[in-house]
Amino acid sequence: GPWLIDVQGNRYFDAISSWWVNLFGHSDLGLRAAIGEQLQRLPHVMLAGCTHEPAVRLAERLSARTGGALGHCFFASDGASAVEIALKQSFHSWRNRGFPNKKQFVCLKNGYHGETLGALAVTDVQIFKDAYGPLLMQSHQVESPDTRLSNEAASLQAMAQLHLDQRNDQ
């Protein structure tokens, strides 16, 4: 659960949950059992051109949740790595289609995506921009959608079109 216990036995509600996110709480019994069971079967396999049954089952469950729209799954070891891989796949896709200059990215203002260089490039946290700006690829921040506004979809579409019109070869 969300509780941390110090050496004196004091309990603290973990409102920080690691630096940025902790999806599962601390020491969840079901998660511990599933990890232990998997360790007994296959502790680690690199999914580079191969797979295993739990990965296949998870991919099928994810695809089913999208109504079958998700045709492929790529599993990464953590969120920052997943963002990094998505950026590389996007660049690679554009390059393969004859657009090697498309190497800038659009991201949401105030977004945080991890601390690899690629993830930091699409993160809008000033302390990271100040520290690592010269190392980061170029990105453009746009306002986050506000679903409380009735015309949000139209304004978001107009903003996206304006952004693309200004940078269509990037």
Feature roles, as predicted:
Residues 26, 44, 113:
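Histidine-centered active-site/metal-ligand motif
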Residues 16-17, 105:
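Short clusters of small/polar residues that mark proteolytic maturation junctions
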Residues 45-53, 69-73:
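Short, flexible active-site-proximal loops enriched in glycine and acidic residues
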Residues 60-169:
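PLP-dependent aspartate aminotransferase-fold enzymes
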Residues 1-3, 20-37, 48-60, 121:
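A structural motif shared across PLP-dependent enzymes of the aminotransferase-like
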Residues 1-14:
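Active-site and channel-lining beta-strand-loop segments
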Residues 11-15, 37-41:
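Short acidic (Asp/Glu) and glycine-rich catalytic loops that position anionic groups and cofactors
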